[in-house]
């Protein structure tokens, strides 16, 4: 059995240096994974770190932890940007990235207030299409008329959860 920590990068943990220190301590105490939420807004929380930038700090502060966002809403992140960010982070981490994909929710207007798709069925279609694109691009294949390189460190691709 593996053990992972699921952290909301909010408040004090919105500082990627603090988050990286927490991850390093978790690794030193035998934890196997370190995962962060991906939100733009959340209830009364004001300070929220970008998970991809924060995970870059975590990657450089650790050596063996599996890392990743749980979950990233593809409808908000855009597949092409997500593919590039994830491949870069996977290379930086030495192949330790896991990407959790999901619909995301519009709780508190987290999507609609920024002009993003709020309808769950439409987000579901975007998730399906996005997962197919990510799979192809991370395998080094052409999709939507383009190849996105470099490929991630993991083969055949980054694990999708």
What feature does the model see in each segment?
Residues 37-41, 70-72, 114:
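Short linear capping/connector segments at secondary-structure termini
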Residues 53-57, 85-87, 147:
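Short, charged beta->alpha transition segments
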Residues 1-61, 155-158:
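N-terminal beta1-alpha1-beta2 module of alpha/beta enzyme domains
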Residues 2-6, 33, 64-71, 96-100, ...:
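Structural preference for beta-strand elements that scaffold enzyme active sites
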Residues 2-14, 75-142:
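Flexible, glycine-rich active-site loops centered on histidine and acidic residues
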Residues 142-149:
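Active-site glycine-rich loop that binds ribose-phosphate moieties when present
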Residues 64-67, 150-154:
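Short, surface-exposed connector motifs at secondary-structure boundaries
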Residues 25, 29, 57-62, 88, ...:
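Alpha-helical structural signal in soluble globular domains
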């Amino acid at each position: 059995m593996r053990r992972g920590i699921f952290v909301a990068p909010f408040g004090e943990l919105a500082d990627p240096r603090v988050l990286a220190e927490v991850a390093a301590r978790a690794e030193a105490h035998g934890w196997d994974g370190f995962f962060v939420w991906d939100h733009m807004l959340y209830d009364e929380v004001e300070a929220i770190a970008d998970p991809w930038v924060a995970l870059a700090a975590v990657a450089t502060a650790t050596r063996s932890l599996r890392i990743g966002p749980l979950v990233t809403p593809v409808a908000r992140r855009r597949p092409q940007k997500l593919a590039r960010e994830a491949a870069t982070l996977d290379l930086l981490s030495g192949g330790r990235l896991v990407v959790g994909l999901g619909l995301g929710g519009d709780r508190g207007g987290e999507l609609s207030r920024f002009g993003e798709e709020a309808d769950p069925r439409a987000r579901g279609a975007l998730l399906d299409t996005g997962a197919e694109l990510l799979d192809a691009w991370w395998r080094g294949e052409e999709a939507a008329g383009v190849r996105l390189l470099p490929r991630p460190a993991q083969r055949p691709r980054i694990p999708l959860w």
